[in-house]
Regions:
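N-terminal secretory signal peptides that target proteins for export/translocation
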Residues: 1-14
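C-terminal motif of bacterial Sec signal peptides marking the signal peptidase cleavage site
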Residues: 27-30
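Bacterial signal peptide processing site
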Residues: 32-35
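Post-signal peptide N-terminal segment of mature Sec-exported envelope proteins
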Residues: 39-61
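Short amphipathic, basic-aromatic surface patches that mediate peripheral association
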Residues: 71-78
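Short coil-to-beta strand junction motifs in C2/discoidin
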Residues: 80-86, 156-158
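An anionic, turn-rich surface loop/hairpin at beta-sheet edges
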Residues: 102-134
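Internal, hydrophobic beta-strand segments that form the core of beta-sheet-rich folds
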Residues: 135-151, 156-166
């Protein structure tokens, strides 16, 4: 068989394998339940003001379903620090249900950015709480997040995504 024919067959095999792999990934994604909550907060000009709280409200549809809570911080490579302090509070009509302070390491000790992303934008995941929780079905909740850095205007943070996902029972 001529060389150019072998190369063409190899290319077709690669496309077939890539196509089958893509279908498999699509199948896996479609099998997972949709997120319970998925909220994006974007900061104008990548500037997060100290007095600008991220506020997310939700009312659980099913109190029997445990939920994993997490957030994604997307920052640019011009962010001036290696870390990000956040104050997070969950309130209900009964008062404060959960409160914490988290120090998210956006870079390692050598200054290399943590997280995923191939360009100037990196994404870092931070869980909220210690595991899956159940919320009361007849209650409305509010999550508030403010940054705890010394800057009045924190530059380099593009957005924060709050995502709650259904846990296995």
């Amino acid at each position: 068989m001529p060389f150019f024919a072998q190369k063409h067959i190899k290319s077709a095999e690669n496309r077939l394998v890539l196509g089958l792999f893509s279908l498999f990934l699509l199948f896996l994604q479609s099998c997972s339940p949709p997120p319970v909550l998925d909220e994006l907060t974007t900061f104008e000009n990548n500037r997060w003001h100290l007095d600008s709280a991220i506020t997310v409200q939700w009312a659980p549809e099913d109190a029997e379903i445990p939920v994993f809570m997490g957030m994604y911080v997307r920052h640019l490579d011009d962010y001036p620090y290696n870390n990000l302090y956040l104050f997070r509070t969950i309130r209900s009509s009964q008062g404060v249900e959960y409160s914490d302070t988290v120090n998210i390491a956006l870079a390692d000790d050598l200054g290399r950015w943590n997280g995923t992303g191939m360009s100037t934008l990196k994404t870092v995941f931070a869980p909220i709480g210690g595991g899956a929780v159940r919320f009361k079905g007849d209650e409305r909740y509010t999550l508030s997040i403010i940054h705890g850095m010394r800057d009045t205007v924190l530059t380099g943070i593009q957005d924060v995504i709050v995502k709650f996902e259904q846990a296995e029972n």
